[in-house]
Regions:
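Short cysteine/histidine-rich zinc-coordinating motifs and their immediately flanking basic loops
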Residues: 312-322
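Polybasic (Lys/Arg-rich)
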Residues: 243-302
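Short cysteine clusters
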Residues: 36, 298-303, 309
Length: 375
């Protein structure tokens, strides 16, 4: 099956559910759960998993409040207003971009009036044309590219990502710019927010490296430091720093090596399977035909279906639904009923389960001795 045919099949599978554009956050999160083929197929089909979770009756809390979203949009607008004045000022601080030599190009929309995947493909081509001009050392080439679209290969399929900005300076390096709305207070950033920002910047850097490689240029032209622009304190005045993403890049490359291939996804997606926003039961049946690997870490990875998959694991009586410590304590025993039967000496343990069985029987005796059950 050709790439175009598989893309058409994925679009048909998505049915009437809305499509969402992937970004660095969703790519990084999906790579954190490489064993879950369900998530991989839904990501490849650009399914709005938040909407899907709502249809399935297990919506997740919004990742950001409306206030936070509005603040983020306001801050990015502030950074880029007046011809990218603040953006260019911060680039001058971090990478010595000379202001008189700054030439800006906005790639936020394609000249061809299309939408969806076709638009992203066209914008990616227009970004490559701008990059070719820039790397040719044309003195009039734009060297600050707003909303450039680069591509990342994940298991043989192409993911198109819109960058906040790319900048090139006289040292012959391309820099990824990441604009975030969390504040820098007294020159300190909350590490809980800094870690995912660094990881997302690494996704964009890797995407830009792959794009240059496909164009015949060296990936070494991309700096492994990203420029992070955030508000200073609690107002919208920008400040900036550089992020060293080398460790994150190494981890991402390892995860990409483990990502499911397109041929594997083709084999796992049943022919004719579609999602339907109008029929919850049909939607659930379709989702259940996609193999998953629920782990408590799915809740931390930001997967919108984590609550749904946990509910299904709980209904099935799987120990994994009780959390990581419990799952690890029970080792090879996957089902709660088997654990309870083993504690009651109702089933004979295998040689791998004998120590666990002895512990469970001992705990059961202590529980009963304390009056917690029938003697």
């Amino acid at each position: 099956m050709s790439t175009d045919e598989f893309e058409a099949r994925l679009e048909a599978f998505r049915g009437d559910l809305p499509a969402v554009r992937p970004n660095a956050r969703t790519v990084a999160a999906a790579l954190d759960t490489p064993d879950c083929r369900r998530r991989r197929i839904l990501e490849a089909a650009s399914v709005d998993k938040s909407e899907l979770a709502r249809h399935l009756g297990h919506p997740i809390p919004a990742a950001q409040s409306p206030f936070a979203l509005r603040r983020g949009n306001l801050f990015e607008s502030a950074v880029k207003e007046n011809g990218d004045a603040h953006l260019i000022a911060e680039l001058r601080k971090q990478i010595d971009l000379p202001i008189p030599a700054t030439r800006h190009k906005d790639l936020s929309s394609s000249r061809a009036r299309t939408k969806g995947l076709k638009e992203m493909k066209l914008r990616a081509k227009e970004t490559q044309a701008a990059l070719s001009l820039l790397l040719s050392e044309d003195p009039y080439a734009p060297n600050v590219l707003d909303h450039a679209v680069t591509s990342l290969e994940v298991g043989g399929s192409t993911v198109y990502l819109e960058q906040d900005a790319l900048a090139h300076y006289t040292g012959n390096k391309l820099y990824v710019v990441e604009i975030k709305s969390f504040p820098v207070i007294n020159n300190q950033v909350d590490p809980v927010k800094l870690r995912p920002a660094t990881r997302q910047a690494a996704v964009y850097i890797l995407s830009l490296q792959q794009t240059l490689a496909r164009m015949g240029h060296s990936p070494e032209k991309v700096a492994t430091d990203a420029v992070l622009i955030c508000p200073r304190n609690y107002d919208l005045t920008p400040t900036s720093a550089t992020l060293d993403t080398r460790q994150e890049l190494r981890g991402l490359r390892r995860q990409l090596d483990r990502a499911a291939s397109v041929s594997e996804l083709e084999a796992l997606l049943p022919q004719g399977l579609t999602l339907s926003a109008a029929d919850t039961e049909h939607c659930a049946e379709a989702v259940e035909q996609l193999p998953n690997a629920y782990r408590p870490a799915c809740l931390d990875s930001g997967c919108e279906l984590a609550y749904y998959c946990r509910s299904r694991a709980r209904d099935a009586g799987e120990t994994v639904a009780l959390g990581t410590p419990v799952r690890q304590a029970f080792g090879p025993v996957d089902m709660i009923d088997d654990v309870l039967a083993m504690a009651d000496s109702g089933i004979a343990p295998s040689r791998y389960e004998q120590d666990l069985a002895a512990d469970l029987i001992h705990m059961q005796k202590l529980y009963r001795a304390a009056g917690g059950g029938a003697a």
